[in-house]
């Protein structure tokens, strides 16, 4: 929105040419989302607190979690609102990737909102029935995959790449591309949701991964950097740095209120939408496997649930004391802040490894 105004004003004053730089607008997007979150946060939390009872607590969970009863949830609505406003202000609204990612965020956020609403109003910790949740996620995930396939304007946009092996590039047919896009979008949506079980546990890795994806998006959309780093050139992908920056700013603003002990929980409205956005951006910039590395915390949390369920069904025994795995460490006696910070440290290391693949090729 403001970009169009700046382009017009540039004819009168060359200083407005700064707005043509993605990095400059990325910084503004992050700061805008951050300050909006800090400013609007208290009012949003007070509004959410009107839903008496807050987030339902699992009866079979760690005993320390019962003190969280009554904490407002659906705080992810603050993230979605500030990200959307920031992107609309600083993003190039003629870019199809911007609108696709915003649409994915809003659609998956709507699923999460309804899931949270059921948990709060009906006092049902399970929320929306799994089959309906996965059906809606599948519809939106497949729609995003189809959109990306049929609007691809360069072969690189529908080619599968393996990190660190620049000679491996697998062209994808329609079905294979859409299936991969579906699994990454829906998979990471649920992976972030599974991780969101402790105060601040999910949002910090999300911020870190978003920042790293912003680097990949910027490089992928730049002819010089893409050629130098031997990564796929995706015209228009650079604009996604605005969304990544907005997520980083909004995420840090939300963490101000979500840090231990949390004043508000993100809820499914935030976790499902942010995970889907990370998956979508990774698919656009053709860095699906790098996302698996950088989002390793989300992957580990998901695998712990899969292993736990499979083991119990096959052998009647549990591998972990409780899944997702962050609860396992809680039940081993780790204080919640220790679990959170150590998972953050792991996330930092994994993101740095992911960024290193830019040169190790």
Curated annotation (Swiss-Prot):
Transmembrane segments: 25-45, 73-93, 98-118, 139-159, 168-188, 200-220, 237-257, 264-284, 289-309, 339-359
Topology in membrane: Multi-pass membrane protein
UniProt pathway: Cell wall biogenesis; peptidoglycan biosynthesis
Subcellular location: Cell inner membrane
The protein's enzyme class: transferase
Matches recorded under Pfam families: Glycos_transf_4
A cellular component annotation (GO) from this entry: plasma membrane
Keyword field: Cell cycle, Cell division, Cell inner membrane, Cell membrane, Cell shape, Cell wall biogenesis/degradation, Magnesium, Membrane, Metal-binding, Peptidoglycan synthesis, Transferase, Transmembrane, Transmembrane helix
HAMAP family: MraY
Protein name, per record: Phospho-N-acetylmuramoyl-pentapeptide-transferase
């Amino acid at each position: 929105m403001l970009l169009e105004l700046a382009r017009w004003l540039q004819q009168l004053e060359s200083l407005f040419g700064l707005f043509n730089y993605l990095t400059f607008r990325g910084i503004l997007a992050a700061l805008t989302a951050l300050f909006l979150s800090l400013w609007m946060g208290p009012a949003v939390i007070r509004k959410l607190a009107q839903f008496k009872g807050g987030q339902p607590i699992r009866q079979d969970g760690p005993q320390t979690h019962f003190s969280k009863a009554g904490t407002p949830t659906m705080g992810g609505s603050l993230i979605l609102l500030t990200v959307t406003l920031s992107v609309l202000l600083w993003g190039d609204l003629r870019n199809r990737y911007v609108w696709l990612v915003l649409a994915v965020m809003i659609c998956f956020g709507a699923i999460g909102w309804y899931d949270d609403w059921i948990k709060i109003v009906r006092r049902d910790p399970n929320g929306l029935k799994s089959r309906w949740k996965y059906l809606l996620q599948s519809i939106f995930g497949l729609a995003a995959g189809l959109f990306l396939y049929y609007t691809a304007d360069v072969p690189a946009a529908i080619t599968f790449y393996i990190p660190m092996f620049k000679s491996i590039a697998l062209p994808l047919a329609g079905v294979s591309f859409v299936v991969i896009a579906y699994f990454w979008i829906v998979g990471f949506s649920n992976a972030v949701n599974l991780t969101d079980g402790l105060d601040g546990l999910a949002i910090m890795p999300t911020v870190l991964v978003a920042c790293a994806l912003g680097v990949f998006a910027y490089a992928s959309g730049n002819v010089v950097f893409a050629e130098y780093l031997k990564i796929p050139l995706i015209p228009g992908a650079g604009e996604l740095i605005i969304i990544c920056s907005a997520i980083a700013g909004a995420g840090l603003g939300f963490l101000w209120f979500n840090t231990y002990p949390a004043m508000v929980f993100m809820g499914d409205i935030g976790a499902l939408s942010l995970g889907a956005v990370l998956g979508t951006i990774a698919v656009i910039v053709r860095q699906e496997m790098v996302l698996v590395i950088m989002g390793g915390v989300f992957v580990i949390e998901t695998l712990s649930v899969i292993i736990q369920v499979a083991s119990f069904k096959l052998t009647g025994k549990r591998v972990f004391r409780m899944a997702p795995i962050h609860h396992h460490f809680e039940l081993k006696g780790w204080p919640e802040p220790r679990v959170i910070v150590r998972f953050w440290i792991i996330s930092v290391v994994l993101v740095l490894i992911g960024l290193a693949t830019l040169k190790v090729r």
